[in-house]
């Protein structure tokens, strides 16, 4: 619902992640179909690409993320680790420390495993995009949601209109973590949380 604090919540999540992580540790893909909410982050070093405002480019960005997820999962498999935190702890960090302790030159770093920063894909106002590319968008979101966490790729989706046309059953089944701010009706609350309650919130985030 308008005025519920969604934009404030999104900015707080982004700022908290920026404060805690360097560009080497975390990268963002920000999608802002409304043009005014996330474009203020253009130019920060954490962005993998300028803030995406063109709906056509959103599908391309998500397809890139799927390929990157699959590439990373192959790297994890080759190094016999289960997720990206284990990769950093057992593979990348020890190799980097050994390289630095040896006083090697940067051009000799070819033997050091590739650093894999976390990637956060944040889509503001999913409803606008779902009205244009419902099937393609749902397919990309579900593929990422199913396997991307181990690869260090995370999705944050937001919408003012939590209808079943936007938060489809398939998307909902694959995104277990949800936050509901104030909504207009009990039906909207049930769409997000599977229970009533969000319609009784004060509307201040």
Segments from the language model and where they lie:
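The conserved Walker
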Residues: 1-3, 159
